[in-house]
Amino acid sequence: MNAELDALKGALDRQREHVLGILEGLSEEDLRRPVLPSGWSCLALLRHLTLDVERFWFPGVIAGEPDMAGQLTAGTEAHWYVPEDMSAEEVFADYRAAIARADAVLAAAAPEQDPAAWPVEIWPTWRLPDVRHILIHVLTEVACHSGHLDAVRELIDGTTWLGGNPYAGQALGAVTA
């Protein structure tokens, strides 16, 4: 990678840590329970981040791996569903594995590199031009969803995500009120 992608990936890594950190300590029941009227659960949002964000944008769009973009066109609603026989541990493991694969794709990428694939069947008139823009898009989406998880976690048990300055290397963590 280069300095620009390193900086963007560093910010993305902090948001990924936020997602995992705010969910730490929740029971399987709380992870599966919808809290907001829209009906998604914390595990469903984590599955969305795994399939529709980490796997789709990095291996699918940037690297052009087959079936990644096809997974999104198959129906994103299914990606917000966690089967009863899929444990929370499996959902978390899938997310971590998707991050590792995404990081490997990014390590081989350049900011100005064109995407290897684009799902024109989903977005025929919209396109992100390069890896830089894709990474910014993903960073924005993960940050938005980490905020959603913050609100839900606070509603569940009063825990909020607090921490020092992430740019100063201070540890971040969840704090129960």
Residue spans for each PLM region:
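Short, contiguous pre-domain boundary segments
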Residues: 1-2
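Short, contiguous alpha-helical
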Residues: 5, 9-24, 28-78, 119-177
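Acidic/histidine-rich alpha-helical segments that form the ligand environment
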Residues: 78-119, 130-143
